[in-house]
């Protein structure tokens, strides 16, 4: 079913709107007919009329018909605005920006094709594909767009997690080196202290001062190494926290998207495919959380 170049669901929505418009149009035409009928019954009771009387009757009829037609045109315009508002509101929920081509509203060929479609839809049970070639058409929106965006976000987080894991290995290596250096410094300090204890009776005051300076320098270097290690550990914790927050945010977006998609497409054939995709993405996120949990710092 592709008479309008739309999928079945959207084409049914168009048919519903055309049915609504036909109903409103029929009511308004009945109102106009009643204006003429009222005129016949209330004013055309004499055998003859003067020119002034005929002019008065026609002017009154013109005013009534003008008011009815104007009211219908205004109401139609407002109705179309409300319809556009519904479409744009739904699009904005998915962060989409729709565009309209006003010039196409006066395309005589397209208008005639729509008229033929209405005629075939409402006057015949045998519908024909008469508008397959109607151009231009809006580019179709992929029903999986939301899931695709979430998938890209998950892939980005996975790549970022790999980078964090690589950085964690580097920091762990640096921490190991720092601990080795610390052990070496402690042993050197102990050796100096032992040497100082065995030779304290023979070392001059200047030599003792030099030794104390050396010990102080070693302590300072050791403290600097510990500070660097602390800063690296803090940076790692911040990165892990950021990744965790991003993961929670994506999981929330995925949950909202799943609920919205279930609501929007639970009557369509695409629902089962979308449900399967969302389930796989949930499994990927659970796996990602387990992998991130391995690198969270212990309290």
Swiss-Prot record:
GO biological process, one term: negative regulation of protein localization to ciliary membrane
InterPro entries noted in UniProt: LZTFL1
UniProt superkingdom: Eukaryota
Annotated localization: Cytoplasm
Main location: cytoplasm
Coiled coil: 96-296
UniProt keywords, alphabetically: Coiled coil, Cytoplasm
Segments of this protein annotated with the region Interaction with BSS9: 145-299
Pfam families from the UniProt entry: Leu_zip
PANTHER family in UniProt: LEUCINE ZIPPER TRANSCRIPTION FACTOR LIKE, LEUCINE ZIPPER TRANSCRIPTION FACTOR-LIKE PROTEIN 1
Family named by the database record: Belongs to the LZTFL1 family.
Function: Regulates ciliary localization of the BBSome complex. Together with the BBSome complex, controls SMO ciliary trafficking and contributes to the sonic hedgehog (SHH) pathway regulation. May play a role in neurite outgrowth. May have tumor suppressor function.
Protein name in UniProt: Leucine zipper transcription factor-like protein 1
Gene name, Swiss-Prot/TrEMBL: LZTFL1
